[in-house]
Amino acid sequence: MLQISHLYADYGGKPALEDINLTLESGELLVVLGPSGCGKTTLLNLIAGFVPYQHGSIQLAGKRIEGPGAERGVVFQNEGLLPWRNVQDNVAFGLQLAGIEKMQRLEIAYQMLKKVGLEGAEKRYIWQLSGGQRQRVGIARALAANPQLLLLDEPFGALDAFTRDQMQTLLLKLWQETGKQVLLITHDIEEAVFMATELVLLSSGLGRVLERLPLNFARRFVAGESSRSIKSDPQFIAMREYVLSRVFEQREAFS
C-alpha cells in the first residue's frame, strides 16, 4: 500500500503541494488530474524518490520513501530510452544495473515485450519504432524489475487519438493481469475518467486535493465491456462533463 500523509513540497523554490493525503491500495489504479502547474508531476517525482519533500511522509508497504528504489517502476512521457541499445537491451537495462545475469535478464525482457505486444521487435532500435511502440518499451522496462508500484507521468500525452486509445486499453489489461498498484498522472479528462478506480483532482496553483472520486469504468472494461460502449454510456459522459467543469473552475479561479 502507498500511504501519503500531510505532504508538503516545493518546486523551484516555491510551494507546490500542500497537505496531500492519499492512499493507494494493492490492485487499485489511482489517477491524478489537474490544470497545468498544479503539482501533478512534482507529486510523482516525490513518490519516485527523485526529489526531496519538505514535510510529511510517503510510505510504500510501511517503508518510508527517501530516494529511488526498484520497488517503484516509472514510465515517462518522453520514454527515456537509450537510442544506442536495441529494444530488448533497453528493457533489460535496469536488470543489468541490478546485477542480473545476462541470459536471465534477456529472458525477462523478452517476456515483458510479449506482454506489451512487441514480440518480434526485440532487435529493433528505438528510432525504428512509432511513438506508441516506444511507450510500450517504456512500460515493459518499468515492469521488468517486478515493482510493487507503477508510476506513469502523462505517458500518452504525445500520441495520436487512436494510439492513445490502444495504449489506455493495454495499460488496463496489464493492470488487471499483474494486480499492481498503478498511479497515473494525466491532463486528459476522458483518459482520467476511463482509467481510474479513484480519481484525484488537484487545485490550481498550490496543489491541494480538491476532490476524490471513486469510479468503476476501468473495472467494467477489464470485466469485458468495450471501451467504446463505456465511453458512450450516459453515466460516463455525465462524469466526464462534471470533471471538466471542476477543472475549468480551477483554471478560472487561478487566472
From Swiss-Prot:
- Keyword Methyltransferase in the entry? The reply is no
Q: Which reaction does it catalyse?
A: taurine(out) + ATP + H2O = taurine(in) + ADP + phosphate + H(+)
Membrane topology qualifier: Peripheral membrane protein
Which segments constitute the ABC transporter domain? Answer: 2-229
Protein localization? Cell inner membrane
| Keyword terms | ATP-binding, Cell inner membrane, Cell membrane, Membrane, Nucleotide-binding, Translocase, Transport
User: What are the recorded GO MF terms, alphabetically?
Assistant: ABC-type taurine transporter transporter activity; ATP binding; ATP hydrolysis activity
Q: Cellular component per GO?
A: plasma membrane
Q: Which family does it belong to?
A: Belongs to the ABC transporter superfamily. Taurine importer (TC 3.A.1.17.1) family.
* NCBIfam families, alphabetized: PRK11248.1 (NF008421)
- Name by which UniProt lists this protein: Taurine import ATP-binding protein TauB
Q: Recite the lineage of the species.
A: Bacteria, Pseudomonadati, Pseudomonadota, Gammaproteobacteria, Enterobacterales
